[in-house]
């Protein structure tokens, strides 16, 4: 190799190394930019929410003050269980029950096709236990319901509030057991009972253990309502579907629904495929169902506590006669 060829090869190698360094630097910058975007998005998510109906951005602080109702279009956004409890229960009177109850993966359920929910769960090999852990971290709850005893305008009640943010409010063995224990305590202490429903139905990862909860809860309610003659009020919020609708959701002595809530057993597409015909739009919305006698009341959120208070005091007065 001549000196000229040696210098030419050295120049080419230097150029290649320079391009490689520049490319690595560019990739690092892109990664940093994406990281910053992710951080910014996380910050935005903690401060703002988007209306599902009109798509306006809503400042979370003002949204909570307005009970998660969009000021622009009046659409009812989903409320988490803690906000619901704050809405209904008098300050400093809430006593939670069974907070130490955790779900076990009895069936060792495993699905390669389930989508990931976060960067922490980016594997195709996510187990049911992984999903439970993710939602526990994300929501601060142990499962998809909070139960407890509290006072509503001075009257002691038993309250269960489902949380759709935890695996779509699906009902598994823990949710069913917590509801059953709440009903049994309300029965033992002669307390009126409220259940706030928000659920996609039975939790498929628990199979028959999940479906069994429907019968177990219904049996506990039978004793509470029929044998002990105690009041049970069911509040249906959007969405309430599947096994929850087919069990305790529709077993209330009084059934209350929020305006424009989606309430169903099976979805529109499933019904159309089963019947082989089209169904009308919005036939599973509160107002349409109310017109066909499925509910007793449609109550806006800002009036709910007052309406419940009147119903309970009327019940107490009637019971004392």
Swiss-Prot record:
Binding site for Zn(2+): 51, 54, 70, 73
Single GO term (MF): acetyl-CoA carboxylase activity
Reactions listed under catalytic activity: N(6)-carboxybiotinyl-L-lysyl-[protein] + acetyl-CoA = N(6)-biotinyl-L-lysyl-[protein] + malonyl-CoA
Pathway(s): Lipid metabolism; malonyl-CoA biosynthesis; malonyl-CoA from acetyl-CoA: step 1/1
Keyword Zinc-finger attributed: yes
UniProt keyword Zinc-finger present: yes
Listed cofactors: Zn(2+)
Domain CoA carboxyltransferase N-terminal: 47-321
UniProt-listed SUPFAM superfamilies: ClpP/crotonase
Gene Ontology, cellular component aspect: acetyl-CoA carboxylase complex; chloroplast stroma
Subcellular location: Plastid, Chloroplast stroma
EC number: 2.1.3.15
Protein keywords: ATP-binding, Chloroplast, Fatty acid biosynthesis, Fatty acid metabolism, Lipid biosynthesis, Lipid metabolism, Metal-binding, Nucleotide-binding, Plastid, Transferase, Zinc, Zinc-finger
Biological process terms in GO annotation: fatty acid biosynthetic process; malonyl-CoA biosynthetic process
Zinc finger (C4-type) boundaries: 51-73
Record's cofactor remark: Binds 1 zinc ion per subunit.
Function: Component of the acetyl coenzyme A carboxylase (ACC) complex. Biotin carboxylase (BC) catalyzes the carboxylation of biotin on its carrier protein (BCCP) and then the CO(2) group is transferred by the transcarboxylase to acetyl-CoA to form malonyl-CoA.
Family classification: Belongs to the AccD/PCCB family.
Quaternary assembly: Acetyl-CoA carboxylase is a heterohexamer composed of biotin carboxyl carrier protein, biotin carboxylase and 2 subunits each of ACCase subunit alpha and ACCase plastid-coded subunit beta (accD).
Protein name according to UniProt: Acetyl-coenzyme A carboxylase carboxyl transferase subunit beta, chloroplastic
């Amino acid at each position: 190799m001549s000196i000229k060829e040696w210098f030419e090869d050295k120049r080419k190698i230097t150029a290649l190394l320079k391009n490689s360094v520049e490319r690595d630097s560019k990739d690092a910058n892109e990664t940093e930019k994406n990281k910053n975007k992710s951080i910014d998005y996380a910050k935005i998510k903690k401060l703002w929410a988007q209306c599902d109906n009109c798509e306006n951005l809503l400042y979370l602080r003002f949204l909570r003050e307005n009970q998660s109702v969009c000021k622009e279009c009046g659409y009812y956004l989903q409320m988490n269980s803690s906000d619901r409890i704050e809405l209904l229960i008098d300050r400093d009177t809430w006593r939670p029950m069974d907070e130490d109850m955790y779900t076990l993966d009895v069936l060792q359920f495993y699905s390669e096709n389930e989508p990931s929910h976060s960067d922490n769960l980016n594997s195709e090999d996510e187990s049911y236990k992984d999903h439970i852990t993710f939602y526990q971290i994300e929501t601060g709850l142990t499962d998809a319901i909070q139960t407890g005893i509290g006072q509503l305008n001075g009257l002691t009640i038993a309250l269960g509030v489902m949380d759709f943010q935890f695996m779509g409010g699906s009902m598994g063995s823990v949710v069913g057991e917590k509801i059953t224990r709440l009903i049994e305590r309300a029965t033992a202490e002669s307390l009126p009972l409220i259940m706030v429903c928000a659920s996609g139905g039975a939790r498929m990862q628990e199979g028959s253990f999940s479906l069994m909860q429907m019968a177990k809860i219904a049996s506990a309610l039978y004793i509470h309502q029929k044998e002990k003659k105690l009041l049970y009020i069911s509040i249906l919020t959007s969405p309430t579907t599947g096994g929850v609708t087919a069990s305790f959701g529709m077993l209330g002595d009084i059934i209350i629904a929020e305006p424009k809530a989606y309430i169903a057993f099976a979805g529109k597409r499933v019904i159309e495929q089963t019947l082989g015909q089209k169904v009308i739009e919005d036939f599973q919305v509160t107002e349409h169902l109310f017109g066909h006698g499925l509910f007793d009341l449609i109550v806006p959120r800002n009036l709910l506590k007052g309406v419940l208070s009147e119903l309970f005091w009327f019940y107490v007065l009637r019971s004392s006669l």
